[in-house]
Protein backbone atom coordinates (compact mmCIF):
# COMPACT_ATOMS: atom_id res chain seq x y z
CA UNK A 1 0.00 0.00 0.00
CA UNK A 2 1.32 3.47 -0.82
CA UNK A 3 0.09 4.38 2.68
CA UNK A 4 2.92 2.39 4.25
CA UNK A 5 6.24 4.27 4.04
CA UNK A 6 9.09 2.41 2.33
CA UNK A 7 11.21 3.12 5.41
CA UNK A 8 8.73 1.47 7.81
CA UNK A 9 10.18 -1.25 10.03
CA UNK A 10 7.73 -3.83 8.67
CA UNK A 11 8.79 -3.16 5.08
CA UNK A 12 12.46 -3.30 6.08
CA UNK A 13 11.96 -6.72 7.70
CA UNK A 14 10.03 -8.07 4.70
CA UNK A 15 12.78 -6.91 2.35
CA UNK A 16 15.46 -8.45 4.59
CA UNK A 17 13.75 -11.83 4.34
CA UNK A 18 13.60 -11.59 0.56
CA UNK A 19 9.80 -11.69 0.49
CA UNK A 20 8.34 -10.19 -2.68
CA UNK A 21 6.28 -7.07 -2.15
CA UNK A 22 3.65 -6.39 -4.77
CA UNK A 23 1.52 -3.32 -5.30
CA UNK A 24 -2.13 -3.68 -6.21
CA UNK A 25 -1.49 -2.63 -9.81
CA UNK A 26 1.29 -5.19 -10.15
CA UNK A 27 -0.80 -7.97 -8.60
CA UNK A 28 -4.01 -7.26 -10.52
CA UNK A 29 -2.24 -6.84 -13.87
CA UNK A 30 -0.97 -10.42 -13.60
CA UNK A 31 -4.58 -11.69 -13.75
CA UNK A 32 -5.95 -9.85 -16.77
CA UNK A 33 -5.38 -9.86 -20.51
CA UNK A 34 -7.10 -6.49 -20.89
CA UNK A 35 -5.15 -3.60 -22.35
CA UNK A 36 -3.95 -1.25 -19.63
CA UNK A 37 -3.61 2.48 -20.17
CA UNK A 38 -1.62 3.86 -17.23
CA UNK A 39 -1.24 7.56 -16.50
CA UNK A 40 1.31 9.12 -14.16
CA UNK A 41 2.91 12.51 -13.63
CA UNK A 42 3.22 15.13 -10.95
CA UNK A 43 0.08 17.03 -11.96
CA UNK A 44 -3.06 16.34 -13.99
CA UNK A 45 -3.28 12.57 -13.48
CA UNK A 46 -6.88 12.44 -12.27
CA UNK A 47 -8.20 14.78 -14.97
CA UNK A 48 -6.36 12.99 -17.77
CA UNK A 49 -7.28 9.52 -16.50
CA UNK A 50 -10.95 10.51 -16.21
CA UNK A 51 -10.95 12.08 -19.67
CA UNK A 52 -9.44 9.00 -21.34
CA UNK A 53 -11.86 6.74 -19.46
CA UNK A 54 -14.89 8.78 -20.58
CA UNK A 55 -13.70 8.90 -24.21
CA UNK A 56 -13.40 5.10 -24.29
CA UNK A 57 -16.65 4.57 -22.38
CA UNK A 58 -18.54 6.91 -24.73
CA UNK A 59 -17.24 4.83 -27.64
CA UNK A 60 -19.04 1.83 -26.07
CA UNK A 61 -15.83 0.04 -25.11
CA UNK A 62 -15.79 -2.20 -22.05
CA UNK A 63 -13.52 -0.14 -19.81
CA UNK A 64 -12.71 0.05 -16.10
CA UNK A 65 -11.36 3.02 -14.17
CA UNK A 66 -8.90 2.37 -11.35
CA UNK A 67 -5.60 2.98 -9.65
CA UNK A 68 -5.90 6.06 -7.47
CA UNK A 69 -9.45 6.77 -8.67
CA UNK A 70 -12.50 4.68 -9.36
CA UNK A 71 -12.88 1.18 -7.96
CA UNK A 72 -10.06 -1.08 -6.85
CA UNK A 73 -8.23 -2.37 -9.91
CA UNK A 74 -7.84 -5.82 -8.31
CA UNK A 75 -11.55 -6.03 -7.46
CA UNK A 76 -12.49 -5.07 -11.01
CA UNK A 77 -10.17 -7.72 -12.44
CA UNK A 78 -11.76 -10.30 -10.12
CA UNK A 79 -15.40 -9.26 -10.65
CA UNK A 80 -15.66 -7.63 -14.09
CA UNK A 81 -14.79 -8.49 -17.66
CA UNK A 82 -13.28 -5.35 -19.18
CA UNK A 83 -11.24 -5.11 -22.36
CA UNK A 84 -9.45 -1.96 -21.16
CA UNK A 85 -8.42 -0.46 -17.84
CA UNK A 86 -7.50 3.19 -17.46
CA UNK A 87 -5.37 3.58 -14.34
CA UNK A 88 -4.11 6.60 -12.46
CA UNK A 89 -0.74 5.52 -11.08
CA UNK A 90 1.42 7.25 -8.47
CA UNK A 91 5.18 7.05 -8.05
CA UNK A 92 4.58 5.04 -4.86
CA UNK A 93 2.61 2.42 -6.80
CA UNK A 94 5.44 2.16 -9.31
CA UNK A 95 8.21 1.78 -6.72
CA UNK A 96 7.95 -1.98 -6.31
CA UNK A 97 6.77 -3.12 -9.73
CA UNK A 98 8.60 -6.00 -11.37
CA UNK A 99 6.37 -7.05 -14.27
CA UNK A 100 3.68 -4.34 -14.64
CA UNK A 101 3.46 -3.62 -18.37
CA UNK A 102 0.79 -1.24 -19.61
CA UNK A 103 -0.15 -1.29 -23.28
CA UNK A 104 -0.01 2.51 -23.23
CA UNK A 105 1.74 4.55 -20.57
CA UNK A 106 1.50 8.31 -20.29
CA UNK A 107 3.90 10.51 -18.31
CA UNK A 108 2.29 13.94 -18.18
CA UNK A 109 4.94 16.03 -16.44
CA UNK A 110 7.50 16.06 -13.65
CA UNK A 111 7.99 18.54 -10.83
CA UNK A 112 9.65 18.13 -7.42
CA UNK A 113 6.97 16.34 -5.38
CA UNK A 114 7.02 13.75 -2.57
CA UNK A 115 10.78 14.22 -2.35
CA UNK A 116 10.74 13.15 1.30
CA UNK A 117 10.06 9.61 0.01
CA UNK A 118 12.95 9.82 -2.46
CA UNK A 119 15.85 11.01 -0.29
CA UNK A 120 15.05 14.61 -1.31
CA UNK A 121 16.40 13.77 -4.75
CA UNK A 122 14.37 15.01 -7.71
CA UNK A 123 15.99 12.62 -10.19
CA UNK A 124 15.24 9.63 -7.92
CA UNK A 125 11.57 10.71 -7.89
CA UNK A 126 11.59 11.15 -11.69
CA UNK A 127 13.10 7.69 -12.14
CA UNK A 128 10.25 6.26 -10.05
CA UNK A 129 7.78 7.84 -12.48
CA UNK A 130 9.70 6.43 -15.47
CA UNK A 131 9.26 2.92 -14.06
CA UNK A 132 5.86 3.02 -15.75
CA UNK A 133 7.67 2.25 -19.03
CA UNK A 134 10.47 -0.04 -17.87
CA UNK A 135 8.73 -3.32 -18.78
CA UNK A 136 7.14 -2.10 -21.98
CA UNK A 137 8.30 -3.56 -25.28
CA UNK A 138 8.24 -2.32 -28.87
CA UNK A 139 4.57 -3.28 -29.22
CA UNK A 140 3.65 -0.82 -26.45
CA UNK A 141 3.45 2.97 -26.37
CA UNK A 142 5.00 5.55 -24.03
CA UNK A 143 3.53 9.05 -24.40
CA UNK A 144 5.64 11.74 -22.78
CA UNK A 145 5.89 15.50 -22.41
CA UNK A 146 8.67 16.74 -24.66
CA UNK A 147 8.58 20.13 -22.93
CA UNK A 148 9.69 18.56 -19.65
CA UNK A 149 13.46 18.91 -19.18
CA UNK A 150 13.87 16.02 -16.73
CA UNK A 151 11.91 13.71 -19.02
CA UNK A 152 14.17 14.64 -21.92
CA UNK A 153 17.28 14.00 -19.80
CA UNK A 154 16.11 10.59 -18.60
CA UNK A 155 14.98 9.51 -22.06
CA UNK A 156 18.58 10.04 -23.20
CA UNK A 157 19.92 7.93 -20.32
CA UNK A 158 17.41 5.08 -20.07
CA UNK A 159 17.19 2.11 -22.41
CA UNK A 160 13.45 2.00 -23.04
CA UNK A 161 12.34 -0.48 -25.72
CA UNK A 162 8.86 1.00 -26.05
CA UNK A 163 7.55 3.13 -28.94
CA UNK A 164 7.91 6.72 -27.73
CA UNK A 165 5.34 9.36 -28.66
CA UNK A 166 6.04 12.94 -27.57
CA UNK A 167 3.54 15.72 -27.03
CA UNK A 168 4.29 19.41 -26.63
CA UNK A 169 2.49 22.60 -25.76
CA UNK A 170 5.41 24.71 -27.02
CA UNK A 171 6.19 23.34 -30.46
CA UNK A 172 4.56 21.57 -33.37
CA UNK A 173 5.77 17.99 -33.55
CA UNK A 174 6.10 15.99 -36.74
CA UNK A 175 4.82 12.43 -37.00
Task: Label the predicted regions.
Residues 161, 165-175:
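Short, intrinsically disordered, charge-balanced linker/junction segments flanking boundaries
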Residues 2-146, 150-162:
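Phosphate-binding loop of NTP-binding sites
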Amino acid sequence: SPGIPKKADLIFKINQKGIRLSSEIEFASEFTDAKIIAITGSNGKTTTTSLIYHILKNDDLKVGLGGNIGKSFAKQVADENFDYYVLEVSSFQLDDIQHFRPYISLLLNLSPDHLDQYNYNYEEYALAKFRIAENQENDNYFIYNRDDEMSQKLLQELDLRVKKIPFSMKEKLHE
